[in-house]
Amino acid sequence: EYIRDKYNFVESEKFIQELAWRDFWRSYAYHHPDQLWKDVEEYKTGFLAQEYADNLPEDIISATTPTQIINVFIEQLTSTGYLHNHARMYLASYIVHFRKVKWQAGAKFFMSHLLDGDIASNNFSWQWIASTFAGKPYIFNLENVHKYCHRSIDILPEKNREIDGSYEEISTRLFPNL
């Protein structure tokens, strides 16, 4: 009630939804603690788990990837310990799908930097992105980033070529085996 009284409906509804997801992930982790670091299901990307790298590439760690917006997200995460929910999903998707790195490596990277890090929310959200705890992989494109982040970040297609394209084009490029 406090949140609903203090904030408008849209703001309070989103916050309450995020709390509900956090509660769901914690409950799931309580009942399935063995799945915090293991794939709940197989990847639904057309690739086997062993085809993904075990470690983050150096350009991700150092925020020097070919994609400007991803570098901005990495720098924000490592310098502030915070990253907006959409930016977390974009960065996770980039790491797993665009760079073919196991979700566990990205989850560890996030947990080492997030001030609000919760292992259950973090890891199962990574699995949802990766498709090991969802029906399909989560992907994004530059248009989606522009829709949710355009006010705070300058987004130029020529500096973000990896993520510039329609969902169909990106999906075909990322998942040629599907």
Describe these PLM feature segments.
Residues 1-85, 93-178:
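C-terminal catalytic domain of photolyase/cryptochrome flavoproteins
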Residues 89:
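Beta-strand-enriched accessory nucleic-acid recognition/scaffold domains that flank the catalytic cores
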